[in-house]
Amino acid sequence: MPIPMVIESTGRAERAYDIYSRLLKDRIILLGTPVDDNVASLICAQLLFLESENPEKEIYLYINSPGGVVTAGLAIYDTMQYISAPVATLCMGQAASMGAFLLAAGQPGMRFALPNSRIMIHQPMGGAQGQATDIDIQAREILRLKDRLNEILSRHTGQPLEKIVEHTDRDYFMGPENAKNFGIIDRILTSRKDVEKDGK
């Protein structure tokens, strides 16, 4: 599917933007795909660029993602925490797996979901092949990442670590209300006016 273009007129000049670049002008980043290394590089670059433009102004990360590669997601997560600009997160459609992790990692008080979105958390998945010693090494690394993700999710949601471990043992689906009660989001939005009341 071709990327839509937007034409803007300023005085006598016209300028064409692809839709994602136009959204970036409004400090909006869209994560609408599975998370892999290429996507993570693009998201991180946009976060760093927007921080350099204005380190105090909010950045809005819209999420509709089934999740993806854990290390790629952690690159986005670490960049969100590293930059000084606050990052608001908003789930539209679904935020599953690493998508839900990034949703929860938004600025406290600025983590949103639309009414018909869904959120899913679970433990990281991985496949290993090769010699027995290599499989053992990879299995231990997956367990290390699982523990680390659970610790981070516990911190951002305010849930006890034991509860995070229990609920991520299998796919755990939530609607917006349950996600709010769980601490993954702060508010459910029904219209843009709900955000504009807070200054955006």
Swiss-Prot record:
This is ATP-dependent Clp protease proteolytic subunit. Keywords: Cytoplasm, Hydrolase, Protease, Serine protease. Belongs to the peptidase S14 family. Its EC number is 3.4.21.92. Its main location: cytoplasm. It holds the Pfam family CLP_protease. It is found in: Cytoplasm. The lineage of its organism: Bacteria, Pseudomonadati, Thermodesulfobacteriota, Desulfovibrionia, Desulfovibrionales.
